Amino acid sequence: MDPLHIGHVRLIKAAQKLGDELIIILNNDNWLKDKKGFVFMPQRERKEMLESICGVDRVVFTDHQPGEYFKDRSVCRLLKKIRPHIFANGGDRKPDGDPVPEVALCEKLGIEIIYNVGEGGKVQSSSWLLAKVAQANRKS
């Protein structure tokens, strides 16, 4: 969720309908720096924006440390701590052949995983948006 976009809003609105409380697990700046090499929007700003969406009860950061992305990019530690009834995933996640650690943990803890939450699958991407900005900057 860096930057936030309409796909995230649709995911959140759909996820609200799945339960009584909506907790968003937000990848922290360390995770983003390891994955992309930079942070576009600082975690505090992303958190504040998410908290301003009606129906979001809580936003929690992952506790990834610098360099940890390549060892553990999952949100398993927080799933163990929060113990939600449902783990909702957006339009870019697949139920088939997706050997992510969250699947095994959710099965073990009895957490239901719901895929493709939101309208219309993957309608936007943070990476796509950043690529458009980079392309526009190259042209100017």
Language-model features: locations:
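Nucleotidyltransferase catalytic core that binds NTPs
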Residues: M1-S140
